[in-house]
Amino acid sequence: MEVLRVELPLAPVERLLRKAGASRVSEDAKVELAKAIEEYAMQIGKKAAELAKHAGRKTVKVDDIKLALREL
């Protein structure tokens, strides 16, 4: 059996799926969605960090996140 590692806790991922209408959620489904969320968050974070650096800052601000979301 493959060991699946994700950074996000799976309980909130399951809650999101249930809120979206799922009555039951497999462990694999939780892990797969968590991996997708992490990947998207990394893309946003990298873009936001680039924007902060371009602005001459080391600190990522909320406006960097908002702009990164619009650009992705």
Curated annotation (Swiss-Prot):
Keywords: Chromosome, Cytoplasm, DNA-binding. Residues 24-26, 58-61 are annotated as: Interaction with DNA. One of its GO terms (molecular function) is DNA binding. It comes from the Archaea. The keyword Lipoprotein does not apply. Pfam families: CBFD_NFYB_HMF. InterPro entries: Archaeal_histone_HMF (IPR050947), CBFA_NFYB_domain (IPR003958), Histone-fold (IPR009072), HmfB-like (IPR050004). GO terms for cellular component: chromosome; cytoplasm. It is found in: Cytoplasm; Chromosome. Binds and compact DNA (95 to 150 base pairs) to form nucleosome-like structures that contain positive DNA supercoils. Increases the resistance of DNA to thermal denaturation (in vitro). Belongs to the archaeal histone HMF family. Homodimer or heterodimer with another histone. Dimers then assemble into higher oligomers, with the DNA wrapped around the protein core. This is Probable archaeal histone A1-1. The gene is hpyA1-1.
